[in-house]
Amino acid sequence: MINYMSMINPKKILLHCCCAPCAASILEWLKENQYEVILYFYNPNIYPEQEYIIRKNELLRYANELGLIVVDDDYKHDEWLQYIAGLEQEKERGGRCLQCFKMRLLATARVAERMQIPVIATTLASSRWKSLTQIEEAGKWAVAQVTGVEFWAKNWRKDGLQERRRILLAENKFYNQVYCGCEFSMNRLD
């Protein structure tokens, strides 16, 4: 795996965030390592819309406490359903998840390109329920569609970040969801 951080050493990173619990320890680590972080909330997969609003508001609350900027994209669940059409019955970590990651990370890469931010990463890589291989594949594919943006395929589960995530979740009293987000993942945590 190429370590893009050693190649370009950016001061700015656009971090795609799925939720506050997954973002907290990552944001702490990035701040400790002197990165300037802008958050991007684009998660059209989350269902129902009320769940989407809860997760978004938790992230906005936490970002506000940290003084961070959040680029908040529109909720486009119908577009997401079209994007994953035909993959509804896939298991978690299957083809539907890969397509979902591609959609969200492509949107992230496009925002980074417009904002001239050289690197994107995602909090999806902190979840033990998600495939790091799929996330990396989707991230690399997404940045190949734009110019001047690289994908940082960091494993946010290592170096004590999983344990720190649990601590920050409790300290901040975050809402902690029990499924990834889409209606197809609600009862399929296999």
Predicted region positions:
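Nucleotide-activated chemistry modules centered on ATP-dependent adenylation/adenylyltransferase
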Residues: 2-190
